[in-house]
From Swiss-Prot:
Reaction catalysed by this enzyme: L-rhamnulose + ATP = L-rhamnulose 1-phosphate + ADP + H(+)
Disulfide bonds: C68-C222, C353-C370, C413-C417
Gene3D superfamilies: 3.30.420.40
The protein's name: Rhamnulokinase
One Gene Ontology term, aspect cellular component: cytosol
UniProt gene name: rhaB
EC number: 2.7.1.5
Recorded family membership: Belongs to the rhamnulokinase family.
Cofactor: Mg(2+)
Pathway membership: Carbohydrate degradation; L-rhamnose degradation; glycerone phosphate from L-rhamnose: step 2/3
Binding site for substrate: G83, H236, D237, T238, N296
GO molecular function: ATP binding; glycerol kinase activity; rhamnulokinase activity
Function field: Involved in the catabolism of L-rhamnose (6-deoxy-L-mannose). Catalyzes the transfer of the gamma-phosphate group from ATP to the 1-hydroxyl group of L-rhamnulose to yield L-rhamnulose 1-phosphate.
């Protein structure tokens, strides 16, 4: 078959898309077309920040039906989402309650309990995952302690992409790359860790053994009656994004830039040393047995909140105003946990500047400048941490995802990090999702083969560092800004 048509469902914390890919195996060309885009936002339910899971499923099905109604024969479907959140099911496979968002405050104070009762080193030795207060391990502990009556009804727990695959196929699956984000998978066995799971109060029977990307979960029957295989892709969106990052060699790092920024490198071995623990490095699962050694950064969430609060719709105009402002007048630590979900992001940023005896950003452009400068300096700091961890410097940084369209931030990143930045592709998560589908259909050999397809089909933008820039001169001064309560213990 010359042409393949694969559908990627890519759900982010603020929006979702159903994308159609067309792959010409003879010429190795790959094109994407957006079929359906929809909003994903939090809602308050019984005092919790929850996801409108039924609305998301409705939009997924609508997007799939749109493809089928065009007369296109779909070869496969794959679903990727954000990590750590889950859906509870009863014995009949029906949903129990609504999935609570990782941004809900129910996990406040839970992680310190684990550090005392299990031990930080022991948790890290078992999982290799960074300490974030909203990891699934702490969410489940909050669930079982705070809602025992709900817990009693539970027979299964599915992570978000696995739930949507289940709703399409009727088959349950626990995909490995996303499962590792829970901090509940043992890094040595690739299975759920009995000790960590027991601490949460959740039953091991809620979960099946994690499966690696590339297996067919089951079939979705389209309106025309065709059975379409649903593939377990690298269902954590960052895992998919890394697959589509055209990393040149071992000296290349990646930055998946969106609501969250995830900076790291690929490795065939995990890093679980005391140094890695001290730096709060995570070893999330990747495709083909690779590890995604990385750190979570709050990312463009801060900007998204400011845009929403200030009702700003013209982002390019705001960036143009921001670029005209002097650099580094206002600096914050974007990873300070005060920015996870404040009532008023603008006021929180201003308070952080005021508390550190800095000028206070007032205009929208000043707020954006504060966010961009601070992110770029944090990127540089973390890239330095990662280089020290592996004992080798990086020579190139690949920025992928929606954030790579921000030319100002890309240049600031290049200047602060002091290395060449390659930006693109924008639709990295979707493309990585498609890549695993094409491998499952035997159209591609492996991840490296797929990256050659990406390099041939998608243009990258290069940013050369300017060592004389204002932000480059502030790199050494930024470290004290990070002496705040970060997203870790």
């Amino acid at each position: 078959m010359t042409f393949r048509h694969c559908v990627a469902v890519d759900l982010g914390a603020s929006s979702g898309r159903v994308m159609l890919a067309r792959y010409d195996s003879k010429h190795r060309t790959l094109t994407l077309r957006e079929i359906h885009r929809f909003v994903n936002c939090l809602q308050k339910t019984d005092g919790f920040d929850t996801w409108d899971i039924d609305s998301l499923e409705k939009d997924i099905r609508l997007g799939l039906k749109k493809v089928c109604n065009e007369g296109i024969l779909i070869d496969s479907i794959g679903i990727d989402t954000w990590g750590v959140d889950y859906v509870l099911l009863d014995k009949q496979g029906q949903r129990v309650g609504l999935p609570v968002s990782y941004r809900d405050n129910r996990t406040t104070g839970i992680m310190p309990q684990a550090l005392v009762q299990i031990g930080k080193s022991e948790i890290y030795r078992r999982s290799g995952i960074q300490f974030l207060p909203f990891n699934t391990i702490y969410q489940l502990r909050a669930l079982t302690k705070q809602q025992p009556e709900l817990t009693a009804q539970v027979a299964h727990a599915l992570l978000m992409p696995d739930y949507f695959s289940y709703r399409l196929t009727g088959e349950m699956n626990w995909e490995y790359t996303n499962a590792t984000t829970t901090q509940l998978v043992n890094i040595n066995t690739d299975d759920w860790d009995d000790t960590l799971l027991a601490w949460t109060g959740a039953k091991k029977g809620w979960f099946g053994r994690p499966s690696h990307p590339g297996n067919v979960i089951g079939d979705w029957i389209c309106p025309q009656g065709n059975r379409i295989p649903v593939v377990a892709v690298a269902s954590h969106d960052t895992a998919s994004a890394v697959i589509a990052s055209p990393l040149a060699n071992k000296h290349s790092a990646y930055l998946s830039s969106g609501t969250w920024s995830l900076m790291g490198f690929e490795s065939k071995m995990p890093y679980t040393t005391d140094e890695a623990l001290a730096a709060n490095i995570t070893n999330e699962g990747g495709a083909e047995g690779r590890y995604r050694v990385l750190k979570n950064i709050m990312g463009l969430w801060l900007l998204q909140r400011v845009l929403k609060e200030r009702r700003i719709t013209d982002l390019p105009a705001l960036i143009a105003q921001t670029e005209a402002l002097p650099a580094c007048r206002f600096l914050i630590n974007p990873n300070d946990d005060r920015f996870i979900n404040p009532d008023d992001m603008r006021a929180e940023i201003q308070a952080a500047c005021r508390e550190t005896d800095q000028p206070v950003p007032v205009s929208d452009a000043e707020l954006a400048r504060c966010i961009f400068d601070s992110l770029a300096l944090l990127y540089a700091d973390i890239l330095h941490e990662l280089a020290n961890l592996r004992g080798e410097k990086f020579t190139q940084l690949h920025i992928v995802g929606g954030g790579c369209q921000n030319a100002l931030l890309n240049q600031l990143c290049a200047d602060a990090c002091g290395i060449r930045v390659m930006a693109g592709p924008v639709e990295a998560s979707t493309l990585g999702n498609i890549g695993i589908q094409l491998m499952t259909l035997d159209e591609l050999n492996n991840v490296d083969d797929f990256r050659q397809v990406i390099s041939a089909n998608y243009d990258l933008t290069t940013y050369i560092p300017n060592p004389d820039s204002e932000i480059a001169r502030h790199v050494a001064q930024f470290q004290p800004k990070r002496q705040t309560k970060e997203l870790c213990a």
